[in-house]
């Protein structure tokens, strides 16, 4: 059971204020190719980039290991934290009150 309830409007604003390209770029180096951003996946070892970030759709996906999701999911995986902590991190970045 989650400790906190986040109204859908607040959660949507959190994701809107945290552009996925900006957040992912704060952890790894992305290279733009066309409409996508590419990098070697931070979640498995690889030599050829298979990790993509789609700014328009605000999601990420790795064609190598299959991991993917939205900005909250990315922070959960990078920080090895739960959803509550990821939301707290993103709210702080966006200057939003919890």
Mark where each language-model region is.
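N-terminal structured subdomain of primase-like DNA metabolism proteins
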Residues: 1-98
């Amino acid at each position: 059971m989650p400790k906190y309830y986040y109204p859908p409007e607040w959660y949507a604003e959190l994701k809107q204020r945290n552009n996925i390209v900006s957040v992912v770029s704060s952890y790894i180096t992305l290279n733009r190719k066309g409409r996508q951003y590419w990098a070697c996946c931070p979640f498995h070892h690889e030599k050829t980039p298979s990790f993509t970030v789609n700014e328009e759709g605000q999601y990420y996906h790795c064609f190598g290991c299959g991991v993917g999701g939205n900005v909250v999911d990315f922070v959960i995986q990078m920080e090895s934290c739960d959803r509550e902590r990821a939301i707290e991190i993103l709210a702080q970045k966006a200057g939003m009150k919890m």
